[in-house]
């Protein structure tokens, strides 16, 4: 699913996509799944299967069907940059197998235990050209980190707790079923609010070293199809009114983080952010302040 949405986004941005890999479905099924999307709507361009190719807006895309990334001949299709979005090959060792087929760089669309992790607007300046495998972190980290950066840069985060109220994802169960060691994760997604673990807050410490060990968090999985929201509650080192905090966030949203961190003071709800391309949209009306050093901040994100 993430791969299909990456393809939509790439087409919107004018990127040249030359190949895709999916070992589980044929090209005709790919056409169907790409054309129709229950959450984001029908694809506005054209998509057909032709001679074994996936043809999107007239552009032929080579289709591979390999379970082992090492067997994908990316070079034959002219692919240089690969988005690894299976959620399976998330370490440097596993993701590097794409390089055997001729890829030059691999971007993992998930957190990684050992690959360098980057969040747009936060730590891209640390990227080095010799890095061949990198992680773009999680959707929640991409929402949390830009906001945490603005707050820490201006007011110093002493410590904080994060909760993400998170839409249903593909790994959840439609009805109650077994789920390994995480028993609650196996409960029916449409019937329950499910407390769950997330490493998103701790991951912020990897992209903002000054916050390492200062943030942790959890998730509540809720029965909505898309769009999630971060609740960041922090103790500040430098006292500030809520209005002062809002002003700094808005300044960043209109300046260095434009297009990454958004700002709204309207009466919004989750569906208002469906297909929103910002990593994070600060909700000025939803946050609250107990005093000038203890504040709860709210930010929305389309988690897909």
UniProtKB/Swiss-Prot annotation:
Catalyses which reaction(s): D-glyceraldehyde 3-phosphate + phosphate + NAD(+) = (2R)-3-phospho-glyceroyl phosphate + NADH + H(+)
Mind listing the UniProt keywords for this protein, alphabetically? Cytoplasm, Glycolysis, NAD, Oxidoreductase
List GO terms (cellular component aspect).
cytosol
Instruction: Please state the protein's primary subcellular location.
Output: cytoplasm
Q: Which SMART domains match?
A: Gp_dh_N
Name the InterPro entries for this protein. GlycerAld/Erythrose_P_DH (IPR020831), GlycerAld_3-P_DH_AS (IPR020830), GlycerAld_3-P_DH_cat (IPR020829), GlycerAld_3-P_DH_NAD(P)-bd (IPR020828), Glyceraldehyde-3-P_DH_1 (IPR006424), NAD(P)-bd_dom_sf (IPR036291)
> GO molecular function, one example?
glyceraldehyde-3-phosphate dehydrogenase (NAD+) (phosphorylating) activity
Q: Where does the record place the site Activates thiol group during catalysis?
A: 166
User: What pathway is it annotated to?
Assistant: Carbohydrate degradation; glycolysis; pyruvate from D-glyceraldehyde 3-phosphate: step 1/5
Annotated GO biological process: glucose metabolic process; glycolytic process
Instruction: Please tell me where D-glyceraldehyde 3-phosphate binds in this chain.
Output: 138-140, 169, 198-199, 221
Q: EC number(s) for this protein?
A: 1.2.1.12
Q: Which compartments does it reside in?
A: Cytoplasm
What are the catalytic residues?
A: 139
Residues noted as binding NAD(+) in the record, renumbered to the chain: 1-2, 22, 67, 303
Which residue spans traverse the membrane?
none
> Where on the tree of life does the source sit, at the highest rank?
Eukaryota
Question: Which Pfam families does the UniProt record give?
Answer: Gp_dh_C, Gp_dh_N
Q: How would you summarize the oligomeric state and partners of this protein? A: Homotetramer.
NCBIfam families in the cross-refs:
GAPDH-I
Name the family the entry cites.
Belongs to the glyceraldehyde-3-phosphate dehydrogenase family.
Query: What protein is this chain from?
Result: Glyceraldehyde-3-phosphate dehydrogenase 2
From the broadest rank down, the organism's phylogenetic lineage runs: Eukaryota, Metazoa, Ecdysozoa, Arthropoda, Hexapoda
């Amino acid at each position: 699913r993430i791969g299909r949405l990456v393809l939509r986004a790439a087409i919107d941005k004018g990127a040249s996509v030359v190949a895709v890999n999916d070992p589980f479905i044929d090209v005709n099924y790919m056409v169907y799944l790409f054309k129709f999307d229950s959450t984001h709507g029908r694809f506005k361009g054209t998509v057909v299967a032709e001679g074994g190719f996936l043809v999107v807006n007239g552009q032929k895309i080579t289709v591979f069907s390999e379970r082992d990334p090492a067997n994908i001949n990316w070079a034959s299709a002219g692919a240089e940059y690969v988005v690894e979005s299976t959620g399976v090959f998330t370490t440097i060792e596993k993701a590097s197998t794409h390089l055997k087929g001729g890829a030059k760089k691999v971007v993992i669309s998930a957190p990684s235990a050992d690959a360098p992790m980057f969040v747009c607007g936060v730590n891209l300046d640390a990227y080095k050209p010799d890095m061949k495998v990198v992680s773009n972190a999680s959707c929640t980290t991409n929402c949390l980190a830009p906001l945490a950066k603005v707050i820490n840069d201006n007011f110093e985060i002493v410590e904080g707790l994060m909760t993400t109220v998170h839409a249903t994802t593909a790994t959840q169960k439609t009805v109650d079923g077994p789920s390994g060691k995480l028993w609650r994760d196996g409960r029916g997604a449409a019937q329950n609010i499910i407390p769950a673990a997330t490493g998103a807050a701790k991951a912020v410490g990897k992209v903002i070293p000054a916050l390492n060990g200062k943030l942790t968090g959890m998730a509540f999985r809720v029965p909505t199809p898309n769009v999630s929201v971060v609740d960041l509650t922090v103790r500040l080192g430098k006292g500030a009114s809520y209005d002062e905090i809002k002003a700094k966030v808005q300044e960043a949203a209109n300046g260095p983080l434009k297009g990454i961190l958004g700002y709204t003071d309207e009466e919004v709800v989750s569906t208002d952010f469906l297909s929103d391309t910002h990593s994070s949209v600060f909700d000025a009306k939803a946050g609250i302040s107990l005093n000038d050093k203890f504040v709860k901040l709210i930010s929305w994100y389309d988690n897909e």
